[in-house]
């Protein structure tokens, strides 16, 4: 007997795979997974037909253009997927009475704060990626009556490409690396985030949440910690500034998220990022 039907967009990504695994552990849960090929979120009619046919209880919306520099160079594509695609998902989900989980980003903030951002702080994205994801948030709040917006940051996991995998690969090819030290955020293990979302989606505590592994670091410190924990002591990491990379899109200098609403609702918080990273690296051996 099916007690819970969950539909996931972009289910082949690193977070999507972990979410599918987590939901399938729940007795009586059916998971319907759509990759890019099966559902084009920019096509309103297609989205409405697929959601109306399956009638899910929960929709987890992960489909997004997450290439920060690519979004800056092709803003139309960014807004088409991240904003209008999210509108299409929100409208279709509302029509069948489904709860909607929209995964957003720390890049909705400008990075000028001196303290971690709460869910109630003013958003002010400085990149097209951040602006398009914030537009998606606004469509979700405008069209869905049962939504969870989950802002997160610096994801890595078993599936797909990510910063940790890149560092481990480069350590096989080089003895030294340059990594930026003027961007600070919170690395987040997708397994931990998936567990949080799986639990949250089965509540009625609707609203916006900040969910990352706790604590913060710069990309430089993150890279150093990866090499230390992995026993790659031959690696020398040097600091550079973001401006030296000459990237198309600006990045917030400080985008640490305060889990204020998690604490307010008495929900279990995510563990420290160092602890999560250690487990991830153990699983890679």
Task: List where the protein language model places each region.
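Adenosine-cofactor binding site in Rossmann-like domains, unifying the SAM/SAH pocket
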Residues: 27-49
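SDR active-site strand-loop-helix element
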Residues: 9, 34, 59-63, 100-105, ...
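Conserved C-terminal active-site "lid" loop/helix of NAD(P)H-dependent oxidoreductases
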Residues: 218-224, 241-285
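N-terminal Rossmann NAD(P)H-binding glycine-rich loop of SDR-like oxidoreductase domains
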Residues: 5-24
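Catalytic helix-loop patch of NAD(P)-dependent Rossmann-fold dehydrogenases
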Residues: 80, 84-88, 95, 108-150, ...
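NAD(P)H-binding glycine-rich loop region in Rossmannoid oxidoreductase-like domains
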Residues: 44-81
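Mid/C-terminal beta-alpha module of Rossmann-like enzyme folds, strongest
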Residues: 14, 203-248, 253
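NAD(P)-dependent short-chain dehydrogenase/reductase
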Residues: 138-185, 191-192, 198-199
């Amino acid at each position: 007997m099916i007690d819970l039907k969950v539909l996931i967009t972009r289910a082949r990504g690193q977070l999507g795979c972990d979410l599918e695994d987590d939901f399938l552990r729940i007795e009586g849960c059916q998971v319907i997974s759509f990759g890019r090929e099966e559902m084009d979120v920019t096509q309103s009619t297609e989205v409405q037909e697929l959601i109306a046919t399956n009638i899910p209880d929960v929709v987890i919306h992960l489909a997004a253009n997450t290439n920060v520099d690519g979004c800056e160079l092709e803003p139309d594509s960014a807004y088409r997927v991240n904003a209008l695609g999210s509108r299409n998902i929100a409208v279709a989900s509302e029509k069948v009475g489904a709860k909607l989980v929209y995964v957003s980003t720390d890049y909705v903030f400008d990075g000028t704060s001196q303290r971690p951002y709460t869910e109630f702080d003013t958003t002010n994205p400085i990149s097209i990626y951040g602006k398009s994801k914030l537009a998606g948030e606004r469509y979700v709040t405008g069209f869905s009556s049962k939504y969870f917006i989950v802002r997160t940051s610096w994801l890595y996991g078993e599936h797909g490409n990510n910063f940790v995998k890149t560092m481990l690969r480069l350590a096989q090819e080089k003895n030294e690396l340059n990594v930026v030290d003027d961007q600070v955020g919170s690395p987040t293990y997708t397994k931990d985030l998936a567990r949080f979302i799986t639990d949250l989606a089965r509540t009625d505590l609707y609203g916006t949440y900040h969910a990352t592994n706790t604590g913060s670091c710069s990309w430089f410190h993150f890279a150093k910690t990866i090499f230390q924990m992995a026993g790659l002591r031959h690696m020398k990491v040097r600091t550079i500034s973001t401006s030296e990379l000459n990237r198309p899109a600006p990045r917030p200098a400080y985008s640490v998220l305060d889990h204020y609403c998690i604490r307010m609702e008495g929900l279990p918080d995510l563990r420290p990022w160092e602890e999560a990273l250690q487990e991830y690296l153990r699983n890679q051996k």
